[in-house]
C-alpha cells in the first residue's frame, strides 16, 4: 500500500494545532496497522506548497523538518502524462488545478494507493481511494 499525502495533511501534521496533527497521526497509524510495509508518497507540487510558508517566514527549523521528511518518502514528479490526466480531472470535477494535479499524481501510483487528505472535494475524483483526515480538536 502507498499512502499519498495531500499537502493539507502534511501541513496539518507539521504546522497544525494538536487536534489537526493527531488526526493525521491517526490515519497514518491505521495505514501501518493494516500494512506494515506501507510506503508514503507526496507530489513535487506538495513539496513546493509545504516549503513556501517556512521560506517566506525564514523559519529554518520548520523548513528542515519538511526537507528531512521529503528525503524519506517517494516524490511523484509532474510528468506530461500526469498533467494531461490532471487536465481531464479538472474538466470533469471542477477541482482547482493544484488539487487536480495532486489527484493525478496519486492515481499514477496505481490502485494500491490511498489519498490522505482533509479536503472532501476529492471525493468527486473517480477511482481515487480517499482516507479522510477527520479533524477533532482536542
Sequence positions of predicted segments:
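Short, well-structured N-terminal submotif of metal-dependent ribonuclease cores
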Residues: 1-41, 54-65, 136-138
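Acidic, PIN/NYN-like endoribonuclease modules and their adjacent C-terminal/linker elements
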Residues: 2, 72, 103-138
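A generic structural signal for short hydrophobic patches within well-formed alpha-helices
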Residues: 10, 47, 122-123
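Short, flexible helix/strand-to-coil boundary loops that buttress conserved ligand/catalytic motifs
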Residues: 14, 54, 90, 126-129
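General small-molecule cofactor/ligand-binding pocket signal
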Residues: 41, 76, 131
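Mobile, glycine- and charge-enriched loop segments
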Residues: 57-58, 66-87, 134-138
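Active-site neighborhoods of divalent-metal-dependent phosphate/nucleic-acid chemistry enzymes
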Residues: 74-118
Amino acid at each position: 500500500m502507498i499512502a499519498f499525502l495531500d499537502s493539507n495533511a502534511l501541513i496539518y501534521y507539521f504546522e497544525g494545532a494538536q487536534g489537526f496533527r493527531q488526526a493525521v497521526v491517526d490515519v497514518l497509524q491505521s495505514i501501518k496497522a493494516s500494512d506494515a510495509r506501507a510506503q508514503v508518497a507526496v507530489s513535487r507540487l506538495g513539496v513546493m506548497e509545504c516549503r513556501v510558508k517556512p521560506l517566506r517566514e525564514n523559519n529554518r527549523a520548520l523548513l528542515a523538518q519538511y526537507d528531512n521528511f521529503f528525503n524519506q518518502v517517494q516524490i511523484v514528479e509532474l510528468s506530461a502524462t500526469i498533467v494531461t490526466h490532471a487536465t481531464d480531472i479538472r474538466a470533469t470535477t471542477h477541482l482547482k488545478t493544484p488539487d487536480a494535479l495532486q489527484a493525478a499524481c496519486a492515481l499514477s501510483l496505481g490502485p494500491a494507493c490511498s489519498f490522505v487528505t482533509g479536503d472532501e472535494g476529492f471525493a468527486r475524483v473517480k477511482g481515487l481511494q480517499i482516507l479522510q483526515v477527520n479533524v477533532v480538536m482536542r
